[in-house]
Amino acid sequence: KKPDRSWKRATENLKPGEIAPIGPKGYDPKKGDVLPYKRDLDLYNFRYTLKFNTYTLSLGSSRTENTSSFYTTNTVYDMETVSNTFSVNLDKILLRNQKSKLTFGIGLKRKHNQSYIEEAILSDRVLTIGDISLNGTTTFYGGLLGASLGYERGMRALGAERDKNKGVRSPKAEFMKYTLNTNYYKPLTQKLVYRFNTTLTHSNDVLYGSEKHSIGGVGSVGGFHRTGNIQGDKAIEIENELSYRVLDSEKFGKLSPYLSYSYGKVRNNKNSSVHRKGYMSGALLGLRYNMKYLDLDLAYAKPLARSNYLKPKNREIYFSATLKFKF
């Protein structure tokens, strides 16, 4: 059920001398009344891939709409962030044999981010980011080991923001960032599978929130989606997962319950506040159902450990559905 915001009035709709309402009719914060929190996350993605010889060209477009609330003494305000990203990538296979594969990639993406409080715009910026990466996979102790080393640089192109006259504590558009991702997949039995993923991010610049490494919630450390996440210019995130395939049918699909534990830690540059650093850990108990054109994922999330300034709920439920098309 979505929180009721029908009582809110835009400034231009108020009569001369009229005060904007702080809540619905009958709302009294002095009696302990609390207005509902609003949290919405909508993701839209499109990706097209074209392969020719040892090259792969990928075009991508995505849109993220994230709404959350924050409280003042007697009312609640809603904040919305909208991000539109267009990307192009070209990958070249350098080495491929029966056991290993090595790929070099270059890419360019343009990000347009806008933030609002109610209907008032807070920020409107464009970042253009170039990146290069080296990606490899190989067999290792009966499993498959993968690693990716990447470098990103903010560029003065396509209408991007520039850093001229910015202070040392101001977020940088012309930043440098390094990333390292590793993953390991190993079947322990015919049905039992172990997965391990780790991500490291390092930058000496103060990054915008869209470029910081974010940890917590869906697709990350479980149990922290509704209470915000932690972000950092430097970060490490680790995930361990065990899954058991109870159904493996070409006709009916694949069904796998799973259990995972994740940990994340961040640090921010030029920041002396309580949010300078943070950590969290959480567990997921879930069920995946994969078919030819549809993937479903339902999970129970439980926060375990955290920094003191984080106030997670006791539990959360996640659900996702993905439609797949090939043409």
Language model segments and positions:
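C-terminal outer-membrane beta-barrel translocator/porin domains of Gram-negative envelope proteins
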Residues: 116-254, 263, 267-269, 309-311, ...
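Transmembrane beta-barrel architecture of outer-membrane proteins
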Residues: 41-43, 83-87, 127-131, 175-179, ...
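Sequence/structural signature of outer-membrane beta-barrel proteins
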Residues: 2-7, 36-37, 64-73, 97, ...
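Outer-membrane beta-barrel "beta-signal"
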Residues: 287-294, 313-327
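Residue-level signature of outer-membrane beta-barrel architecture
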Residues: 50-52, 92-94, 136-138, 184-186, ...
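Repeated loop/turn-to-beta-strand initiation elements of outer-membrane beta-barrel proteins
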Residues: 52-59, 66-67, 96-102, 140-145, ...
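Transmembrane beta-barrel wall of Gram-negative outer-membrane proteins
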Residues: 9-135
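Transmembrane beta-barrel strands of outer-membrane/channel proteins
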Residues: 1-5, 9, 30-33, 59-63, ...
